[in-house]
């Protein structure tokens, strides 16, 4: 079949590599537009506020689609029912396209009401209107992505996302430059219009790929006619019954952002800031802190995406042991990603801000507070993917909802008292609560105790050791008056090298675990040479 299937770890690394590229392009354009004095933190506030509302509607309308379809399709593919898998795809395309159109129209025509009456920030209206058509294209792309991932083909999923981000980055900068003589809210709307352009391009790419392989797909479908095909109505009910609880987690995540929109802007004004200053302070969180924290989250999302179809297929074949093994391995790698990222951002927050935002370097202290959410959010991503793969689709949403309620209460009480540092703290608390509950639920279902030493303690020891090296290198370079840009880059590179060495020295990854990686044998040879040195 033309739609090629990849192994679990190859699929993970394809998605992971694409996410790294996406974040690189995302960083570039966000840093560029933030450094325009006309845009800066105020523009980021309008941009980020609009995106939070858009993300919420997108979560309700589309977020459960890829995982739902990949789960149902992978179950059919595991037993050879390619005809049933394709009917799931066709039904989903009709159903979710209709839902997306309704939400897009609601956002476009309700933009003024939302911005004035809910957000108390009238300038967000134009951002919401420019984002609304993107919901339709994202929904249709999500159906196609879910179909390909369900067949364990991660390549086209990843290519489409990279293409989308490249186009988004280019057009965002172009539109902002074209609108430099206008107000920050209009520039923010221009930048978000690029999202709609990019989403339509990604959908077109996936559609072309599907049509290119349509003949081969139909040939495979005809070979599986021995299977009974469910009715469209039955499939639609099944899609909705899975999509709603899977979306619930994403909806709650998006709601946590909206909680900040509703509580923080109002709280900052009660704290004593005027509307413009409150927008600037909130813009630091949305436009700087959030995008830096998002890097490790986007890299690790590969495990969440790949685990759902893999576990579903393994369970359909009655192979629970294999599924559990992949979960433990994924959790360990998630720890290896999250811990050094959090510590690195904490130690280098100020030099990183000076490097990336030379024209608007304020806010490093907020990153130092909020960066600890990375640990809990990254690990939680993997936990949610595992729970959904096992069919425990309501649990992630419930865990997140409990954390969101606590976050809302803390924001309402403490933002008017202590200002912009509060949402940074409550974001950490929110993710800690959700992650802890999901962890308990997963291992209770698996009926086994987690190996804390292997999963967390060894990666933590390697991370702490890396932290000492980071401090020493940075202090040394400051002492000999190396400029901040060169200092920061050298320190980050030294930290990465040190971390790899400590992972090898402390035997954080076993040889058989390394061999599961693409080019695992070659990596093992390199690690063995490091041990000898």
Model-inferred region functions:
Residues 33-56, 184, 188-192, 234-242, ...:
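Interfacial/gating helices of multi-pass transporter permease domains
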Residues 7-67, 104, 108, 134-135, ...:
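Signature of the first transmembrane helix
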Residues 155, 166-209, 394, 402-439, ...:
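Membrane-interface helix-loop junctions in multi-pass transport and translocation proteins
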Residues 1-28, 83, 87, 226-253, ...:
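N-terminal membrane topogenesis motif
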Residues 472-533:
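Membrane-proximal transmembrane or re-entrant/amphipathic helices at the cytosolic face
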Residues 138-160, 372-402, 413, 417:
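Membrane-interface junctions at transmembrane-helix termini in multi-pass inner-membrane proteins
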Residues 112-130, 346-377:
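Interfacial segments at transmembrane-helix termini and the short loops linking adjacent helices
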């Amino acid at each position: 079949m033309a739609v090629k299937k990849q192994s679990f770890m190859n699929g993970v690394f394809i998605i992971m590599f694409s996410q790294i590229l996406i974040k690189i392009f995302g960083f570039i354009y966000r840093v560029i537009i933030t450094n325009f004095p006309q845009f800066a933190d105020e523009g980021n506030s309008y941009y980020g506020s609009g995106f939070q509302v858009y993300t919420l509607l997108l979560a309700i309308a589309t977020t459960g689609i890829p995982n739902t379809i990949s789960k149902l399709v992978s179950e059919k593919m595991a037993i050879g029912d390619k005809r049933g898998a394709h009917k799931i795809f066709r039904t989903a395309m009709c159903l979710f396209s209709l839902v997306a159109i309704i939400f897009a129209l609601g956002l476009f025509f309700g933009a003024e009401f939302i911005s004035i009456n809910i957000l108390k920030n009238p300038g967000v209206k134009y951002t919401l209107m420019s984002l609304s058509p993107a919901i339709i294209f994202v929904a249709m792309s999500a159906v196609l992505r879910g179909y390909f991932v369900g067949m364990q083909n991660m390549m086209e999923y990843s290519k489409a996302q990279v293409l989308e981000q490249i186009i988004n980055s280019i057009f965002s900068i172009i539109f902002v430059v074209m609108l430099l003589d206008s107000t920050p809210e209009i520039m923010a709307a221009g930048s978000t219009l690029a999202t709609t352009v990019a989403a339509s391009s990604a959908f077109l790419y996936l559609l072309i790929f599907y049509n290119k392989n349509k003949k081969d797909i139909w040939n495979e479908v005809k070979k599986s006619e021995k299977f009974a095909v469910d009715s469209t109505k039955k499939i639609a009910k099944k899609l909705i019954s899975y999509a709603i609880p899977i979306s619930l987690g994403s909806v709650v995540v998006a709601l946590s952002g909206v909680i900040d929109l509703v509580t923080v802007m109002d709280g900052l004004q009660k704290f004593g800031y005027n509307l413009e200053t409150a927008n600037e302070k909130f813009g630091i969180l949305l436009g700087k802190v959030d995008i830096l924290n998002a890097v490790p989250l986007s890299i690790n999302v590969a495990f969440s995406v790949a685990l759902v179809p893999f576990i579903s297929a393994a369970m359909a074949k009655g192979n629970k042991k294999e599924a559990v093994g992949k979960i433990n391995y994924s959790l360990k790698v998630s720890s290896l990603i999250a811990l050094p990222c959090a510590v690195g951002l904490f130690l280098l927050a100020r030099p990183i801000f000076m490097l990336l935002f030379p024209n608007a370097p304020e806010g490093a202290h907020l990153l130092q507070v909020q960066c600890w959410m990375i640990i809990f959010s990254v690990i939680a991503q993997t936990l949610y993917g595992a729970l959904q793969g096992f069919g425990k689709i309501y649990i992630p949403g419930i865990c997140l909802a409990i954390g969101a309620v606590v976050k809302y209460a803390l924001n309402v009480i403490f933002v008017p008292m202590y200002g912009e540092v509060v949402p940074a703290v409550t974001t950490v608390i929110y993710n800690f609560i959700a992650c802890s509950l999901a962890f308990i639920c997963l291992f209770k279902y698996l009926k086994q105790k987690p190996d804390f030493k292997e999963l967390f303690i060894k990666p933590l020891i390697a991370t702490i050791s890396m932290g000492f090296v980071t401090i020493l290198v940075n202090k040394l370079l400051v002492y000999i008056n190396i400029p901040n840009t060169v200092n920061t880059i050298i320190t980050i590179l030294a930290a990465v090298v040190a971390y790899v060495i400590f992972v090898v020295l402390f035997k954080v990854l076993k040889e058989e675990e390394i061999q599961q990686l693409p080019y695992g044998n070659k990596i093992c040879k390199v690690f063995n040479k490091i041990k000898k040195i």
